[in-house]
Regions:
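The feature marks helicase ATPase cores and/or their adjacent C-terminal helical subdomains
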Residues: 1-525
Length: 525
């Protein structure tokens, strides 16, 4: 057990694997975690061990030995091999099969239906907690809001249709666990290491219990103070009591991430939980002093200037984290757009607006002044221009124009662009989706104005990396600086609130900013 940033994954598990490798070999050593990203980190850590390198095992050797719990259960059960994993394309088929699924078919759902669709979230949470749909609905916090636009009657009907749709054709994560937990197949395991054990759901714990019966050594690695997936079946009380007994070398104490200021503040947040379960943790900070500053809002707080200056003038990373979507939509993203910062969600590789698109807006004035641009760059202008500025709405056919640099006047003479364009330096006003007199800006107009703001604020070459994500999204991450929003939209268990705040704050290495509530309800820290 160890608090955030004490090397549970990169140091302790590495040491344990090395020890058991000498004792048992690698053939029947299993290391499990919850996500593919975490599994890759573990794989990279373990395969960097000198003795493991000397084994010269193929990469595939570790695919079934260092992986997610779902992957292991899928590969070690009697689940029919002809079943395909239910994915995005299967979801599209399902929507045609039963139209009620399409009732929540927005852009976020279409991108990742298994995580974002209310039905699949509810189904996963019910299964993770070991409850049927009716009991899960009764025990959920404001389910009508959480699983909007569906009510229990709809979800039950959808469950029946979903099960019928995937019968003998598809399998999902719940099926993988169910087949494994009901299997009579013998397992041969020398040692089993479970990372982030505190996040295990009810069926995952049953799966680990089954594995443990066949293992010579079982090690659970984690931190009960970071148990924040109760809605999906995690049991903080069980792991608080389990890990409270851990002492000696199995208790990690040296902090490798958080500065003194963040470490001190984080311990104040979590101390009431330590007191309740009657244990104390030794958790040292790094040598850096760091700071924790408070923001009353994201408009005019005194400490906000410090944050903006650091975001604008450093090459460090900044993480905005929060409890609800209201925080994201109503003040965090509006602040980032207003200040003209480039940003992205923690799950995305690319910024909200990519550099290629930004370049179109930034280089347009110089193109008008006669600076030659490549054919590819001019095509980017042409694709986005409103049709009234195109003398020829179609882009030149391949081979009909030489691939070289051209000036604005060259394309006017060739009959593709209008001379009228010279009157407008701001490309965003020429965009095909720009609405000058609209009472309420649509998505594209807001985006165009945001791009213009980046250029106005001279943030095109921004060095800092700015990300956002809710407390559950950011768990497991490390960033240089963290901004923690305390706003709540509903009442929650006091210890749950402390764990959420603790997880959010301890993502930071150097400095933290605490944003006071903007809703009237505030996270207890």
């Amino acid at each position: 057990v160890g608090p955030p940033g004490t090397g549970k994954t990169h140091i302790k598990i590495k040491e344990l694997y090395k020890e058991y490798l000498h004792k048992y070999g690698s053939e029947r050593g299993i290391v499990l975690t919850h996500t593919n990203v975490a599994a890759k980190e573990l794989k990279d850590t373990i395969t960097s061990i000198k003795e493991v390198k000397e084994l010269k095992k193929e990469e595939e050797f570790f695919e079934d030995r260092i992986c997610t719990i779902h992957s292991y259960t899928n590969n070690n059960s009697e689940i029919p091999r002809n079943l395909k994993v239910f994915d995005k394309s299967a979801y599209e088929e399902l929507c045609k099969y039963y139209s009620l699924f399409g009732k929540a078919n927005n852009v976020y759902v279409r991108k990742n239906p298994m995580e974002k669709h209310p039905f699949f979230k509810f189904k996963s949470n019910a299964y993770g907690r070991g409850l049927d749909f009716k009991k899960c609905w009764m025990k959920s916090e404001n389910p009508s809001r959480a699983y909007d636009p569906y009510d229990l009657k709809m979800l039950l009907a959808m469950q029946e249709k979903y099960n019928k749709f995937k019968e003998k054709k598809y399998k999902d994560f719940e099926d993988m666990l169910e087949y494994f937990n009901n299997s009579k197949q013998d397992l041969v395991i020398d040692f089993l290491i479970v990372d982030e054990a505190q996040d295990c759901s009810v069926p995952q714990m049953l799966a680990i219990e089954r594995m443990a019966k066949h293992a010579k050594v079982v090690v659970m690695v984690g931190d009960p103070n970071q148990t924040i997936f109760q809605f999906a079946g995690a049991n903080p009380d069980f792991f608080e009591k389990l890990f409270a007994k851990v002492k000696g070398d199995d208790e990690l104490k040296k902090g490798l991430r958080c500065s003194k200021a963040i470490n001190t503040f984080a311990k104040k947040i979590i101390k009431p939980i330590w007191d309740f379960y009657r244990y104390e943790r030794v958790w040292s900070p790094t040598d850096e002093e760091g700071s924790v500053q408070f923001l009353t809002n994201l408009k005019g707080s005194p400490a906000l200037k410090n944050l903006i200056n650091k975001m604008r003038n450093s090459n460090e990373s900044f993480l905005f984290t929060y409890r609800s979507a209201k925080s994201r939509e109503d003040w965090i993203l509006p602040f980032l757009k207003r200040e003209g910062f480039k940003f992205k969600h923690v799950a995305n590789k690319n910024n909200h607006v990519g550099d290629e698109e930004l370049n179109v807006y930034y280089t347009w004035p110089e193109f008008l002044k006669g600076v030659p641009k490549s054919l590819g760059e001019i095509k980017q202008y042409h694709e986005r221009l409103h049709k009234k500025y195109k003398c020829n709405k179609n882009w030149p056919r391949e081979g009909s124009i030489i691939n070289k640099e051209y000036t604005f006047q060259d394309f006017v003479r060739k009959g593709y662009l209008s001379e009228e364009l010279k009157k407008e330096n701001s490309f965003y006003k020429l965009h095909k989706k720009y609405k000058k007199d609209s009472e309420q800006d649509d998505y594209q107009t807001v985006k165009i104005k945001y791009i213009n703001r980046i250029i106005q604020k001279d943030n095109l070459n921004q060095k800092s990396i700015i990300e956002y994500g809710n407390f559950h999204d950011v768990k497991g991450l490390t960033r240089d600086n963290v901004i923690v929003d305390l706003s709540l939209t509903r009442d929650e268990d006091k210890f749950d609130q402390r764990r959420l705040g603790f997880v959010g704050l301890t993502r930071g290495r150097h400095d933290a900013w605490i944003l006071k509530t903007q809703t009237g309800k505030e996270l207890i820290i």
